[in-house]
């Protein structure tokens, strides 16, 4: 087909646009990835010797980048080893799944293996669904097929790309030099175009990314149908955004149409001959599935008798580019959309719809051509937003699904790019993709479900190679192995004390900060540990469980009951020392007391060999060797090795004098000073 003056003018505009885009991309500096571990990893792998002034600087730079990537001060040796193994594992994956797994950023080897196994199962199931009916027939798919899989089919053919080619016949009808078009034919094609299914088959589309481009044949093939009810439920800002994105999408399709060779599909009319289009067969590249009338829908005949499916309560509204930009005014004859609060919208009359469908008549109205964008080929049929791959489109379409579910309900948490949208959406549907069949508990990720199911099966696949103990989670195994290796990776930045577990470090840091996050709701007293709060709360529960007739007291558990009961009945405590007759309420107190008689000192200092009868005395003694002073004054910054010394020091700031003389009433901050003062009264 010869190109007219209008076509040459469009090619000139295309060249100018490409040069402008290239200049703009050259002027913009590359964005700084920042100091995150991922950025350091990327810089570490791409570092070149020429970037440094010399070998010493190159080595120093590599050490700095590797340190920023692996974070040895925060990770253990096992975690660093697992990170390196995970990187190599992702590198050796097959090309068809490597990029998809890397985009999901698995945090452990176990999670990466689970993702690869899921993808392999889905790819195998896809290959089984490809049905070949002989040469020259179509490939019918229940789901979009990756390009690599489609190429294996004998019926999938790719024609060589032509260097110079005029637009396709259907697009030429819209963009041709003649502004006169048959509005009746445009309306027929628009109304007969199939509706895109919003929901993909359950559990398949999210894991399958379309690697090949999927292009519509012409502008009418990507006309989007939105019911007036759905359009009315959108707020003004979202309507404006939809218009902008639809216009951008049409411009992309316009620029792509002239570069893609057409593929004739049997049974589908792409010209102007007036033949019927068969809606029961879809082209593989369109990515559409055949659809018949669903329950509650009825067929209607268009002007040439082509059947199309439409819901009885939804009027299809075709968003052509001029309407998407808001340049085509809504006349009283055509009607205009109202807000959902009014609820009195009526479909436009037959003649008005015909005029609206014939509104865009020239290439100028479709916007300037843009450069070929192979990474934006998947259009949302509801808002017109463009996506680089099919999995992102499916994930985006669930937003519209949730909007339909939440009409009339307060579901504002779904919008605004909430990262937990998928979980909220599944909660609205009353089901989740990953559900435990034993207890019914639902999870947002398959790896979480696998970890949970081990609580039912009792499976413990992670075994310690030293003692043979098994664990259900890899993290629990790493934590256990520190008891054998003596590793203590968590260090207190204040005093330098090291710990094997992060929870112990957090508990220790409260000594320095004075934080007491556990507060009693009865009296307001705060505690640094939850166990201390539990013990304290029992003092407020006097009316519970075990009342006494002798003293009217009540205790919260059976152990104090037995102790108090023995004090009332036998006038003695439960644990009595056979040597001196002294009694104790707890067995551990009796054991500690008996060491004063036996002279036993089971706790030995490894540095000087001195023995102690109590573990607390050994810990206090070891601070003499280490010089550790974990107790810091927040007023002046002084540090102390014992908590009692810090408490005594704090009284110099607060002015507290808790020791009072019973003779004259004078108060003192230390008990030793009170004792010295009392000697003045006794002589």
From Swiss-Prot:
Please tell me whether the keyword rRNA processing is annotated for this protein: no
Which tissues carry this protein? Expressed in heart, brain, placenta, lung, liver, skeletal muscle, kidney, pancreas, spleen, thymus, prostate, testis, ovary, small intestine, colon and leukocyte.
> Looking at the record, which segments are called Disordered?
147-185, 230-301, 322-368
Q: Mark the C2H2-type zinc finger spans by residue number.
A: 378-400, 434-456, 462-484, 490-512, 518-540, 575-597, 603-625, 631-653, 659-681
Which terms under GO biological process does the entry name?
Answer: negative regulation of transcription by RNA polymerase II; positive regulation of transcription by RNA polymerase II; regulation of DNA-templated transcription; regulation of transcription by RNA polymerase II
Locate the Phosphoserine modifications and list their residues.
166, 178
**What region holds the SCAN box domain?**
41-123
Family note:
Belongs to the krueppel C2H2-type zinc-finger protein family.
The miscellaneous annotation reads: May be involved in the EGFR-mediated promotion of invasion and anchorage-independent growth in glioblastomas via silencing of SIX3. May act as a prognostic indicator in glioblastoma patients, with increased expression correlating with poor prognosis.
Q: What is this protein called?
A: Zinc finger protein 263
């Amino acid at each position: 087909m010869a190109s007219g003056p209008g076509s040459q003018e469009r090619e000139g505009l295309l060249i100018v646009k490409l040069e402008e885009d290239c200049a703009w991309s050259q002027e913009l500096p590359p964005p700084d990835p920042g100091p995150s571990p991922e950025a350091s990893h990327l810089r570490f792998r791409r570092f070149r010797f020429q970037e440094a002034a010399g070998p010493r600087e190159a080595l120093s730079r590599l050490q700095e980048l590797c340190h920023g990537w692996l974070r040895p001060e925060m990770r253990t040796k096992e975690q660093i080893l697992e990170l390196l193994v995970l990187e190599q594992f992702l590198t050796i994956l097959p090309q068809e799944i490597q990029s998809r797994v890397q985009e999901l950023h698995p945090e452990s080897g176990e999670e990466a293996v689970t993702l690869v196994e899921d993808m392999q199962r889905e790819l195998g199931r896809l290959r089984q669904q490809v049905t070949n009916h002989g040469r020259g027939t179509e490939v019918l798919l229940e789901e979009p097929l990756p390009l690599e899989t489609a190429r294996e089919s004998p019926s999938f053919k790719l024609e060589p790309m032509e260097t110079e080619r005029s637009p396709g016949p259907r697009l030429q009808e819209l963009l041709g030099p003649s502004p006169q078009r048959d509005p009746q034919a445009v309306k027929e094609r628009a109304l007969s175009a199939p509706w895109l299914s919003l929901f993909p088959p359950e559990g398949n589309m999210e894991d399958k990314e379309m690697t090949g481009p999927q292009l519509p044949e012409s502008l009418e093939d990507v006309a989007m149908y939105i019911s007036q009810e759905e359009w009315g439920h959108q707020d003004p800002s979202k309507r404006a955004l939809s218009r902008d994105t639809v216009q951008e999408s049409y411009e992309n399709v316009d620029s792509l149409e002239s570069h893609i060779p057409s593929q004739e599909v049997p049974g589908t009319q792409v010209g102007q001959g007036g033949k019927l289009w068969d809606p029961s067969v879809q082209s593989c590249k369109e990515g559409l599935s055949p659809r018949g009338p669903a329950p509650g829908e009825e067929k209607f005949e268009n002007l040439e008798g082509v059947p199309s499916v439409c819901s009885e309560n939804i009027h299809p509204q075709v968003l052509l580019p001029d309407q998407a930009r808001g340049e085509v005014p809504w006349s009283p004859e055509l009607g205009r959309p109202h807000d959902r609060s009014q609820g009195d919208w009526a479909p436009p009359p037959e003649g008005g719809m015909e005029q609206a469908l014939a509104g865009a008549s020239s290439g100028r109205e479709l916007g300037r051509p843009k450069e070929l964008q192979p990474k934006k080929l998947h259009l949302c049929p509801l808002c017109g937003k463009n996506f680089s791959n099919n999995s992102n489109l499916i994930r985006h379409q669930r937003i519209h699904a949730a909007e339909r579910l939440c009409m009339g309900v307060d579901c504002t948490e779904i919008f605004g790019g909430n990262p937990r949208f998928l979980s909220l959406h599944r909660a609205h549907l009353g089901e989740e993709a990953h559900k435990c069949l034993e207890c019914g508990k639902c999870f947002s990720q398959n790896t979480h479900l696998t970890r949970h199911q081990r609580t039912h099966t009792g499976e413990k696949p992670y075994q310690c190679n030293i003692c043979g103990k098994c664990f259900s989670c890899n993290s629990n195994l790493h934590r256990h192995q520190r008891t054998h290796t003596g590793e203590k990776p968590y260090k207190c930045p204040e005093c330098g004390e090291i710990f094997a577990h992060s929870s112990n470090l957090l508990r220790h840091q409260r000594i320095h900060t004075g934080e007491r996050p556990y507060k009693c709701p009865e009296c307001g007293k705060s505690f640094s540990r939850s166990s201390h709060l539990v013990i304290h709360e029992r003092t407020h529960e006097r009316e519970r469980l075990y009342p006494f007739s002798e003293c009217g007291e009540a205790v919260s558990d059976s152990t104090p009951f037995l102790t108090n009961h023995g004090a009332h009945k036998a006038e003695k405590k439960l644990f009595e020392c056979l040597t001196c007759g002294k009694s104790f309420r707890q067995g551990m107190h009796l054991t500690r007391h008996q060491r004063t008689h036996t002279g036993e000192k089971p706790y030995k200092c490894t540095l000087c060999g001195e023995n102690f009868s109590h573990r607390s005395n050994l810990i206090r003694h070891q601070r003499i060797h280490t010089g550790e002073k974990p107790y810091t004054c927040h007023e002046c910054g002084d540090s102390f090795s014992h908590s009692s010394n810090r408490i005594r020091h704090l009284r110099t700031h607060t002015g507290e004098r808790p020791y009072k003389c019973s003779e004259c009433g004078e108060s003192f901050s230390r008990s030793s000073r009170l004792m010295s003062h009392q000697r003045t009264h006794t002589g």
